[in-house]
Amino acid sequence: MYNFDKVIDRSGSDDLKHGALLPRWGRDDLLPLWVADMDFETPSFITDALKARLEHSLFGYTMEPEDYLPSIIDWVHDHHQWDVKREWIRFIPGIVKGIGLVVNVFTRPDEKVIIQPPVYHPFRLTPEGNGREVVFNPLKMKEDGYYEMDFENLEKIYDEKCKILILCNPHNPGGITWSKETLQRLADFCYEHHLLVISDEIHADMALFGHKHIPFASVSDKARNISLTFQSPSKTFNIAGIVSSYAIVPNEEIRRKFYPWLSANELDEPTLFAPIATIAAFRKGEEWRKKMLAYIEDNIRFVEDYCREHIPGIRPLRPQASFLVWLNCRDLHLSHDALLDLFIDKAHLALNDGEMFGPGGEGFMRLNVATPRSILKQALQQLEKAVAQL
């Protein structure tokens, strides 16, 4: 019923993954496996819902459909065992935009934001772009290649100017589903130090290999009272171009400060198609989601097997969530420039450079495996050939 092996020609769609190759890398002959969207068709139950609305020829001002908030509430309850109330939820115009909004509402220009690199680069760029200092609490790499939070260092780098900690849960690029114990410990620290937590949970519905996502706000009363959770169906159902993000804020005091500000600036009003796509995804998407995740798991196994047999100098870290694979290339013993030259000019691949994710990302590349296996095989063959010439 669902064909994830089908290769889709994305030309003519103005997609970023292909369209930005020339301005970003100076060449457009690269196989793009960088931008975190899928090369799979957006499922038909979403496109059918959008087409049905398009058949009505009037596109004036609209209200949220009646089932918009209930569809979110039911999905979060069924998948994450978290009971969310209607008044906790508001549409936001994108998760990165939401981070910028929170930074502006809850901090002054002389205050600081804590992030834990290597991590999704807008966590640094957005606060810095808004004139806030970003403080690093780098994750610690364990012997197995996975990461853990460094709570001792967190205590050291904290000062009273720190007002927000941005959490990536699940973690990008490491693909980590943080344990309940880790999240509780983080909540205890942030509560005691009066830190507001923004929990980016855009990959929440993409847990893999038996792992489970745990919403930060669900782990304790402390977590619930200091956090804003940002979620979206965009990654899971490949609708990033339809802005469909939302905030979940259990604490009334935080809501009273943030939501009226959103409303005053009309930033909590979803575009026409966002609720339609969200409802379709959350009401009809479970079978597709499971099959998609199974395909992603097989793609990850394919990368692992291929690297082990043909490119042993590159060690993929198996993600516990998401379709992003963190490639450890340090055994190649290449400088940063030489590593980029290997992937771009020799293998003709466009991946995300590990250094863009901050301290700890050196010697890594991020690979998007949400693509037909034939494309993934081609990419690995090109990489194998390039590495063999080192």
Regions found by a protein language model. Give the residues of each.
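Active-site phosphate-binding strand-loop segment of PLP-dependent enzymes
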Residues: 139-211
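PLP-dependent enzyme catalytic core of the Aspartate aminotransferase-like
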Residues: 155-156, 223, 333-335, 342-351, ...
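Conserved core segment of the aminotransferase class I/II
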Residues: 48, 52, 221, 225-297, ...
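Conserved PLP-anchoring active-site segment centered on the Schiff-base-forming lysine
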Residues: 105-127
